[in-house]
């Protein structure tokens, strides 16, 4: 994520999270989300809006946060591992999408054949370092 910070590209999270997720994560990691490179303006937690993925509400809120800060949502690259809960709703609000298929355990595509799931995303990512290639920054 260092190269994203250096390029001044904001990084956010959309998560089905409980109220304790952030403080527990930060306690276990020994650092804050901000220190890790996440921008507070782009953190969407389901418990805050009482809506969970795959609801478009979280993604619409993120798109609004982008627009308010002069970022075109069509230029946002959203990476997720779940076809139904990440890729489809992110695509519906206009984000470019990357299906994370780094391992079979985390990849969630349901009964959809992989090739079909992959075709619904703008890119397939098997390693987070590939994000750099997708956003064409070096």
Protein language model features and the residues they cover:
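Asp-based, Mg2+/Mn2+-dependent phosphohydrolase catalytic module
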Residues: 2, 9-138
């Amino acid at each position: 994520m260092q190269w994203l910070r250096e390029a001044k590209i904001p990084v956010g999270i959309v998560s089905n999270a409980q109220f304790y997720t952030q403080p527990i994560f930060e306690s276990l990691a020994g650092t804050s989300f901000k220190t890790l490179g996440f921008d507070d303006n782009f953190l969407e937690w389901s418990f805050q809006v009482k809506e969970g993925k795959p609801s478009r509400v979280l993604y619409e809120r993120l798109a609004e946060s982008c627009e308010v800060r002069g970022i075109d949502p069509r230029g946002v690259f959203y990476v997720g591992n779940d076809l139904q809960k990440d890729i489809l709703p992110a695509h519906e609000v206009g984000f470019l999408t990357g299906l994370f298929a780094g391992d079979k355990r985390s990849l969630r595509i349901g009964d959809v054949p992989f090739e079909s799931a992959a075709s619904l995303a703008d890119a397939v990512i098997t390693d987070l370092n590939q994000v750099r290639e997708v956003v064409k920054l070096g």
